[in-house]
Amino acid sequence: MANSQTTRVPEPDEALEVTQNGVGSEDRPDPPVPAPGPRRKLILHIDLNNTILVSDAVTCLGTLAALDGFLSTVTWGKMNQKGKWEWLSDAASLIPPCEGAISYYSQFGRLPGFTSGPGRRFRGILDEHLDLLRWPEGITADKELSVKGEDGRLYHWILPSFFQLLRDLVSREDDFCLLFRTFGSDLPRVLSAVSRTLTQGAHPLFPDLPDLKLSVNQTPGKIRCSKREVVLTRGEDKVSSLNGPRDLYQYLGAGSGLGGFQDTFDWWSKHSCSLMGGKPLWVDPFDPTVQHIFFDDNIRQNDKETIVHPMVFLERGGEAVRTASTCELYDVCLVQNDLLKAISDSGYFSRRIAICQENYEKNVQQGGDLLGHGRCTTENH
């Protein structure tokens, strides 16, 4: 959708400073959460690892290793003329601080002990955020909600900011459905832990969550992609795109409460971890009742290395879709998760949603078209 407002892009030599609020934080505060009022139903698709969990069951990474590895993806440098790595910023940021910068991870791949070796200058960021992740002192470990780190200390398994998001959504009187979307094997455990927290008040920081009256569908679903079709299954439900994707869009939009689906890692890997093999997301710019928002740390502005495949309907009620680039939906329906800020700022998820809602409404009002243009490299992070 057309967007006449201009967002200032950082100059090439500007580094986004790391503050206590996380990656790329600025002096100015985030936009406020909108006042309660009638809005589109929110369908929130939320990744698990490095989005609301600081661990990775697929790669068997614990809390320290997962956070250490994440830092290698948000710290930037380049190879100099002598063929040696040269750091371009002492700050961590989701976007490159200048033209030509590449992340350490993109250049060298995963390196165990990144902040104890070449990334030692970022060790302070690691330690600061590990402290923020600590399980409350004096509170007994919980088999589902806490996890013992490699250093023997207890940490939150699910970020507290996720539970704060649930509080905020209910207090704002939003109509919403929250769907976990993961390639990994943690989904059953997450659904169980969240259900117990919402029904039994098991979380020491959020004992009042049962008052929210939210339901959790603990049956893990699956979304399987092939050249022929996309098939969604959950329990006895089965929906296919064989006759068009509209049925899948309507199924996801009709949900309530919380649930989750395991997506197809092999399909993404087969497509070289690019947009075309990513987790499918259908968006209908003609639907006045629903807005889909997808949080994932692996959403990238480069479609050759991003994790969500957005498909936009071309006409009202139709079946035809086109693939949208990440930049078209960035901060409208796609949010590149800032793990450091999600750890340090309890209102992070709610503010990101508010930004997406604001951008969506502006774009609809300015042209009736959904898609934004050039929203990439914004400073809202």
What are these regions (language model features)?
Residues 2-201, 205-211, 323-381:
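Alpha-helical substrate-recognition element adjacent to the catalytic core
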Residues 36, 172, 184-381:
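C-terminal cap/substrate-recognition subdomain and adjoining C-terminal extension
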